Structure formats: C-alpha cells, structure tokens
Curated annotation (Swiss-Prot):
GO molecular function per UniProt: DNA binding; DNA-binding transcription factor activity; zinc ion binding
Gene assigned in the entry: SPL13A
Induction text: Negatively regulated by microRNAs miR156 and miR157.
Motif Bipartite nuclear localization signal location, chain numbering: 158-174
Entry's cofactor comment: Binds 2 Zn(2+) ions per subunit.
Positions annotated to bind Zn(2+) 2: C142, C145, H149, C161
Protein species of origin: Arabidopsis thaliana (Mouse-ear cress)
Region (Disordered): 75-94
Record text about domains: The SBP-type zinc finger is required for the binding to DNA.
Binding-site residues, Zn(2+) 1: C101, C106, C123, H126
Protein name as it appears in the record: Squamosa promoter-binding-like protein 13A
Length: 359
C-alpha cells in the first residue's frame, strides 16, 4: 500500500504563505496580523502600556510635569532652610546687645571697656566705688569674687569681701619659725640633777658638775680661800663631775696684795633633815681626802696633806665650812648666807673664774 505524502494544497495553504517580515512603519506583523508599534511599547519610567502616539506625548508631558514638581519640592526645603538660617543669624545679631552696668542710673558705654567689665556687667568706675545702689540696696563690688555684696561683708578700707580676704590671707601667710634663742627661764622647770655653775663676773662658764640625784633639791655652798703668790692666775678646779662619780668645784685664786676667796652659794631646803646634811658633808670630805690629784693641785709638797678639822655646821647656818691646813697656802674661809666670803677679818668679793675639769 503506497502512501501519498502529497498533501492537498488546501491543507497547506496556510503554511505555504511566507510570513511578511517587512517592517512596517510603527508596526510589527506576525502571520498576517499586524499591530502598531505603539501597542507594544512600554514606558520605562512609569511602566504603563501606551496605546498610541498621542497617549505617549501626553504621558511624556505628565512625566515632565512630575519631574518639575519633584525638583520644586526638593528645592523648597533648601530654600526654607537657608531662609531659616538667615533668620536665626539675623536674630543672633539682633539679640547681641551691649551689656549695661547693674548700678541704678548708670548708662556707661561698654564699647571700649574690657571684657572683664562686660562679662560681670559693671563699669570701671563702679567696680571701685565704695558704695553703689542696685535695686534700691546699698552694695559694693568685690574685686576678688567679682560680685556685688552687702556692705556688712566688707571690712573698712578693703576692696574684697571678708570671706575672700580670709582665704587669701590664709594662703599667703607662712608659719612663723619658733624662736631659737634660749629663754631666760630655761632651767626654771628643770627637775632632776642640778647644774652647778661658778662665775665671778659678767662671763658665765657652765660646768658639767652635777650633784647626786639622791640629794634631792639640796644644793651645796662651798668656799675655799687661797693665799700666796705661787699662783699668778685665777683658776677653777673641779673634783669629780664626771658621769662615773660626783664631786664639787673648788675655785682657787690668789693675789699678791690681798687674800681672795671664791664661793658659790645655793640655798638649802629649809625643811631638810640634819642627817641628810651630815651625810652630804661626809661625802664631800671623803671625796677630797681620798683624791691624790686634789693633793697634787692644792699642795706643793707631797708630804703635806690637808685635813678637815671642823665638823659640818647645822642647817640653820646654811653654809658648809671647809678648812685646809698644810703648807700655809690656805687659810680659814667660810661662806655665809649673804653670798660673801669671810677670810680672817676681810670680806672679799668673788672674782672671775674659769672652769677646769679633772677626773
């Protein structure tokens, strides 16, 4: 069976016709159907289908008008901002008025004044005026706190208030150094071992001779008289006076013409017991009697030994009498209560002495 693949022209009549692809002005045709180009054009900005050319021109005008509206809308805020800024600047310039003085009735010109007066609203004259009137109250301008205060807060003749002056003076004042010099009553409140000094004139030579603390406040008055020409200078010898032992100072002086003696008297306590005085004298005599150095100083010969012949006196005499015999260098001498020394029939004043220490 043979197939006839030849189709009838009636069946392929639609296929035999070639499509007309010739471009038409403003239209595209497919399969014999043609449509205007404007039918398939889309507005890229608005996304709307534009049917004909008249609508295209109308939409274009709308787009142009819309763009102009947007531009005008964007331009208006900028203009308003600039105008508002101009207004604020103008207001700022208008509000920057020249300050005036706070004092009642003062119309001073601050154009040539310093910034200090402009800031505190006071003219140069009223800043130094003692009394000004502000709102009916009498006040005064403080130079340090730069404010007006009542007159009660100021001292007379001061330009600053009392509060500021107090702080200012406290900062400026420095602590005064204490007086280094020794006061007159340096030994007034001293308690304990007493310092024994011997002097016969305007010069005072303190020594380190101290009494035994067990003696209490009782002091010793000793007088030694020296006679002879073997010593040409006034000297003073200390027996003991070292920290290890106690002793007494014996001033010795000589003069070729007259007999001089030296004494230093310190008051005894009036209520002292006689037994204490006796033990004190025994201590003094034992120290002098047992000392070889004292013998070498007081005597030119080693064989001559001074002896204590007279016993200690009672407390009422207020003196201790010491008598030395030997080579004739010393004579009887006693210290009386008035501070003078009696040697024989002659009362002699105390000469100047110089301390000499030995152990």
């Amino acid at each position: 069976m043979d197939w006839n693949f030849k189709l009838s022209s009636g069946y392929l009549s639609g296929f035999d016709q070639e499509p007309d692809l010739s471009p038409m002005d403003g239209s595209i045709s497919f399969g014999g159907s043609s449509q205007s180009k404007a039918d398939f054009s889309f507005d890229l900005k608005l996304g709307r289908n534009i049917g004909n050319s008249s609508s295209v021109f109308g939409d274009t005008e709308q787009v142009i008008s819309l763009s102009k509206w947007k531009d005008s809308a964007l331009a208006k805020p900028e203009g308003s901002r600039s105008s508002s800024s101009k207004r604020t600047r103008g207001n700022g310039v208008g509000t920057n008025q020249m300050p005036i003085c706070l004092v009642d009735g003062c119309d001073s010109d601050f154009s040539n004044c310093r910034e200090y007066h402009k800031r505190h609203k006071v003219c140069d004259v009223h800043s130094k005026t003692p009394v000004v009137t502000i709102n009916g109250h009498k006040q005064r301008f403080c130079q340090q706190c730069s404010r007006f205060h009542a007159l009660e807060e100021f001292d007379e003749g001061k330009r600053s208030c009392r509060k500021r002056l107090d702080g200012h003076n406290r900062r400026r004042r420095k602590p005064q150094p204490e007086h280094i010099g020794r006061p007159a009553n340096f030994f007034t409140g001293f308690q304990g071992s007493k310092l024994l000094e011997f002097s016969g004139g305007s010069h005072v030579f303190p020594t380190t001779s101290v009494l035994n603390p067990s003696w209490g406040n009782s002091l010793v008055s000793v007088a030694v008289a020296a006679n002879g020409s073997s010593y040409g200078q006034s000297q003073s010898y200390v027996v003991g006076s070292s920290p290890a032992k106690t002793g007494i100072m014996f001033p010795i002086s000589s003069s070729p013409n007259s007999t001089r003696s030296i004494a230093k008297q310190f008051p005894f306590l009036q209520e002292e017991e006689s037994s204490r005085t006796a033990s004190l004298c025994e201590r003094m005599t034992s120290c002098i009697h047992d000392s070889d150095c004292a013998l070498s100083l007081l005597s030119s010969s080693s064989s001559s030994v001074p002896h204590l012949l007279q016993p200690p006196l009672s407390l009422s005499q207020e003196a201790v009498e010491t008598v030395f015999y030997g080579s004739g260098l010393f004579e009887n001498a006693s210290a009386v209560s008035d501070g003078s020394v009696i040697s024989g029939n002659e009362a002699v004043r105390l000469p100047q002495t110089f301390p000499f220490h030995w152990e």
